[in-house]
Amino acid sequence: MWSCSWFNGTGLVEELPACQDLQLGLSLLSLLGLVVGVPVGLCYNALLVLANLHSKASMTMPDVYFVNMAVAGLVLSALAPVHLLGPPSSRWALWSVGGEVHVALQIPFNVSSLVAMYSTALLSLDHYIERALPRTYMASVYNTRHVCGFVWGGALLTSFSSLLFYICSHVSTRALECAKMQNAEAADATLVFIGYVVPALATLYALVLLSRVRREDTPLDRDTGRLEPSAHRLLVATVCTQFGLWTPHYLILLGHTVIISRGKPVDAHYLGLLHFVKDFSKLLAFSSSFVTPLLYRYMNQSFPSKLQRLMKKLPCGDRHCSPDHMGVQQVLA
């Protein structure tokens, strides 16, 4: 699937053992993501969404953010096979860089990435609010619809401007209105700033404030309504996972934008290397679709009970499913 002919322009280096090992390793990672990661992501993201929607009364604001990330994970899991089976650096590509299919697939990918980043940032800010001011109205699940509308509406509006640049760079010769919007790199720069820099700064700000609150010994720290330590561990693990897996993708977008914006011809060697690393960064980004729900499954203490209540409501023929069904026990174990 993968090729490392970007080492030089001859392609003879592909016979070297190091190149063969690299090709084999990346191909195995891609196949592992398709065979294991995609089904796990679809399964656990769907369970996360259904279990929380079924237990709306016990949902908290962190659960709302994880539901948004799970919906974005479902979209990414559905897109992963098409992206991973046809990167431009592979032997078999399903589309060209400027093709209609690429633009169509880029829309849900960008929206899902923005939703994941926004939800992570809001999760951090909400965690700080709950830590500093327990039982506040702002940290209430009462605002679920407004939060979901803000996250997805903001992601759609943000990606719309980037979509215009992508489309105009493809149909620039057919539409006069696109004459001044033929720069696809502007779309990448917009995504990097609004989709990564802003959420990263918000998350960093929330974590700094949260660390100050945790260091202060106040009477509120003995409040029975305070967040459990497991909630803080889940927050830290989620932030590290999301930004750790998405940072390479946005850094490559930024690097590609800087190189192309110079207006100088780029050597084929470096351009091929850039596309190769870009494909690898997307592989890491897609892996977030199944890593995040697994973190929620194993670090959220209320999820097993929610899943049990959901399974009890599922019909098995003319009777309800038994709570000790083998499949349920395997998921809960």
Curated annotation (Swiss-Prot):
UniProt GO molecular function: G protein-coupled receptor activity
GO cellular component, one term: plasma membrane
Listed transmembrane segments: 31-51, 66-86, 103-123, 147-167, 190-210, 234-254, 280-300
Pfam families, per database record: 7tm_1
Membrane topology, from the record: Multi-pass membrane protein
SUPFAM superfamilies: Family A G protein-coupled receptor-like (SSF81321)
Cytoplasmic-side segments: 52-65, 124-146, 211-233, 301-333
Extracellular compartment residues: 1-30, 87-102, 168-189, 255-279
Gene3D superfamilies: Rhodopsin 7-helix transmembrane proteins
Keyword Glycoprotein: yes
Predominant location: membrane
Keywords: Cell membrane, G-protein coupled receptor, Glycoprotein, Membrane, Receptor, Transducer, Transmembrane, Transmembrane helix
Location in the cell: Cell membrane
Entry-listed glycosylation sites: N8
GO process terms (BP): adenylate cyclase-inhibiting G protein-coupled receptor signaling pathway; defense response to virus; regulation of cholesterol biosynthetic process; response to interferon-beta; response to type II interferon
Family indicated by similarity: Belongs to the G-protein coupled receptor 1 family.
PANTHER family: G-PROTEIN COUPLED RECEPTOR 146-RELATED, G-PROTEIN COUPLED RECEPTOR 182 AND ESTROGEN RECEPTOR 1
Functional note: G-protein coupled receptor required for the regulation of plasma cholesterol levels. Receptor for CHLSN, a gut derived hormone which mediates an inhibitory effect of intestinal cholesterol absorption on hepatic cholesterol synthesis. Cholesin-binding exerts an antagonistic effect by inhibiting PKA signaling and suppressing SREBF2-controlled cholesterol in the liver.
Protein name: G-protein coupled receptor 146
Species, as recorded: Homo sapiens
Organism phylogeny: Eukaryota, Metazoa, Chordata, Craniata, Vertebrata
